[in-house]
Amino acid sequence: AHRIYILGLRSSGVLAGFLSFYFNHIFEDVVNVGAAQGETFEQMLRIGPNDVLIAISFPRYSQRTLKAVHYAKKQGACIIGITDSTSAPLAAMANHVLLARSEMASFVDSLVAPMSLLNAIIVAVGLRKKHETSNTYAMLERIWSEYDVYEKNEEIHSAP
């Protein structure tokens, strides 16, 4: 793909952010399309046939997500849908569908299964693009060390 767009709104936004964070370490051109970044359609304005949209939608399905997927599909992008059921609205629109259960035991959405699926995807893609991923993390480790991004106190890690 020329560019990878990752879309998740409302509670699915945290999932999209997680996937975008790691895909940015693996791929050159990743766009996290989300409410925090501005208007959805403006962020996806240039999506086209050489691009992929990974759309994440769980109950209660966001209309804005579905409308953005419709737009991307009209522009010829390949749609990968991550949702909870083959009967979910996103499943009917996607070229490829990955399923993960989402339970709503209370007013809080349980995103444990979707997060596990995304973790597996990130690891699998990272292994497939092992050389690029290794180079990226070697560069990042140098930057993190030079700019003290992470705590270096070893006592923190050895505490009981």
What residue ranges belong to the model's regions?
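A short, charged, Gly/Pro-tolerant segment at domain boundaries
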Residues: 131-160
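Glycine-rich phosphate-binding loops that contact phosphosugars or nucleotide phosphates
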Residues: 2-116, 122-127
